[in-house]
């Protein structure tokens, strides 16, 4: 049964009425990894899986919510002290509170929602949930909050109600996503531009290694520190360098002897990655997917050898992609596990999947997962 039908039926059973249906999307990031907190570019797009919710105002000061995926019903008020215990419900509660903080009106509503974003694959299911409700509440109460602020409502929900200090990329992609386009977002200025991404004759497939190595958060903080150290050293000679992404490669060479070797490698990766995003955008405008793919491989090399956030499983998948003549492949997300994102020609797709299915479990003792994704629209009302 399709998701919308399932939601409609459950809503009718629980609330005896019909509401309006809203949806938002998970996201991929084609290139531009670990650049967000360095003030650089990211290059995400919304994908064809996400969250869908039916919502109807109920004339009270209570939200009554049912999650189909968790098979759980929760009621909560709209004041700060009413925060629900359930993690999934605190996302909806946070969106309500953050809307109020921005001068928006929020009153009670009934809702049933479900999702088809694979959890734990780094596709931002939480951002899809926040964006669905930020969009729905804005629409139903006619709050006229602009799209930028809807994305920030999602981000602030993570910060203030879910204990996650995330950047803006996931929510931005989820709200601004457009079918057949990727979004180049400048994380320092929040300027953005759409680029066509509709590769005829190619598939975009994620291979989930199904591993998550534990050191992720401490290692992540250490890398942020390295980047800040490098930026600080460069800033002494070049005052215009606010973030590492503002630096030129030759400026980094000038301070090579002043910073630890590790900091130099981290900075070398980031400065290179900022340029690669721009090169990929140029290539897409020319329709040159070979260059796009080559840049993806270069990013993987940088993440593995310079930034050192890959792992044996992801490096194995990347090498296997090269062997199978996959156009582009790289680790996607924070690293230390998770997915590779692969741009594969249609005629090579079956052979690539078969090779991974055979060779990955033989080496690592468990099966990977595969997700084909298509670049799609972000937050919207579903007719």
Placement of each model-derived feature along the sequence:
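Gly/Ser-rich oxyanion-binding loop with an adjacent helix/lid
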Residues: 1-22, 28-41, 75-79, 85-198, ...
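C-terminal nucleotide
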Residues: 2-27, 52-85, 181-328, 343-383
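Short Gly/aromatic-enriched secondary-structure transition segments
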Residues: 39-46, 223-224
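Short, charge-rich binding segments
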Residues: 44-46, 54-57, 103
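FabD-like malonyl-/acyl-CoA
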Residues: 127-128, 339-343
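Glycine-rich phosphate-binding loop
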Residues: 336
């Amino acid at each position: 049964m399709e998701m919308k039908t399932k939601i409609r039926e459950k809503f009718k059973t629980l609330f005896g009425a019909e509401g309006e249906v809203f949806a938002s999307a998970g996201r991929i990031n084609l290139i531009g990894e670990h650049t967000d907190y360095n003030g650089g570019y990211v290059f995400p797009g919304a994908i064809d899986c996400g969250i869908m919710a039916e919502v109807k105002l109920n004339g009270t000061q209570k939200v009554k919510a049912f999650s189909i995926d968790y098979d759980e019903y929760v009621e909560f008020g709209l004041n700060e002290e009413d925060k629900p215990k359930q993690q999934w419900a605190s996302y909806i509660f946070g969106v309500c509170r953050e809307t109020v903080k921005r001068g928006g009106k929020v009153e009670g509503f009934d809702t049933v929602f479900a999702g088809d974003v694979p959890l734990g694959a780094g596709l931002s299911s939480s951002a899809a949930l926040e964006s669905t409700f930020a969009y729905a509440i804005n629409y139903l109460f006619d709050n006229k909050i602009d799209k930028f602020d809807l994305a920030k409502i999602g981000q602030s929900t993570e910060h203030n109600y879910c204990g996650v200090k995330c950047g803006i990329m996931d929510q931005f992609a989820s709200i601004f996503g457009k079918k057949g386009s990727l979004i180049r977002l400048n994380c320092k200025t929040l300027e953005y531009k759409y680029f066509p991404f509709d590769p005829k004759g190619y598939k975009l497939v994620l291979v989930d290694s199904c591993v998550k190595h534990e050191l992720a958060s401490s290692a992540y903080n250490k890398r942020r520190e390295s980047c800040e150290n490098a930026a600080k050293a460069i800033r002494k000679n070049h005052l215009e360098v606010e973030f590492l992404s503002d630096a030129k490669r030759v400026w980094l060479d000038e301070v090579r002897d002043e910073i630890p070797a590790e900091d130099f490698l981290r900075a070398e990766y980031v400065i290179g990655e900022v340029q690669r995003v721009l090169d990929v955008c140029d290539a897409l405008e020319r329709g040159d997917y070979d260059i796009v793919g080559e840049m993806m491989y270069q990013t993987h090399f940088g993440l593995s050898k310079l930034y050192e956030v890959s792992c044996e499983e992801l490096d194995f998948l990347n090498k296997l992609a090269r062997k199978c003549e996959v156009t582009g492949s790289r680790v996607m997300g924070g690293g230390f596990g998770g997915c590779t994102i692969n741009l594969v020609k249609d005629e090579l797709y079956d052979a690539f999947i078969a090779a991974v299915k055979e060779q990955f479990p033989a080496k690592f003792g468990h099966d990977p997962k595969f997700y084909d994704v298509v670049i799609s629209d972000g937050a919207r009302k579903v007719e």
